[in-house]
């Protein structure tokens, strides 16, 4: 599985990088994902979780 939040499903989004002359090239905005150990089905597991989910208390570390 790729880098995606285990709880909220947040992942990198895409858009355009714009120069001063308004030329455009593709770029990515990466979500603030942290690798943490949480309980999944009663067992500790290392998963990617967004910082927003950690701060809001949607998951607790083991």
Swiss-Prot record:
Q: Which domain of life does the protein's organism represent?
A: Bacteria
Output the GO biological process annotations, alphabetical, semicolon-separated: translation
Per the record, its GO cellular-component terms are: ribonucleoprotein complex; ribosome
Identify the species of origin: Staphylococcus aureus (strain NCTC 8325 / PS 47)
- GO MF annotation: an example: structural constituent of ribosome
Q: Which InterPro entries match?
A: Bacterial_rp_bL28, Ribosomal_bL28, Ribosomal_bL28/bL31-like_sf, Ribosomal_bL28_bact-type, Ribosomal_bL28_sf
Q: Report keywords, A-Z.
A: Ribonucleoprotein, Ribosomal protein
Q: Does the keyword Isomerase apply?
A: no
Q: What is this protein called?
A: Large ribosomal subunit protein bL28
Residues of the region (Disordered) are 1-22
């Amino acid at each position: 599985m790729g880098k995606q939040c285990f709880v909220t499903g947040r992942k990198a989004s895409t858009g355009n990088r714009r120069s001063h002359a308004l030329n455009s090239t593709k770029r990515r905005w990466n979500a603030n994902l942290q690798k943490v150990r949480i309980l999944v089905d009663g067992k500790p597991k290392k998963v990617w979780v967004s910082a927003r989910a950690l701060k809001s208390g949607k998951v607790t570390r083991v």
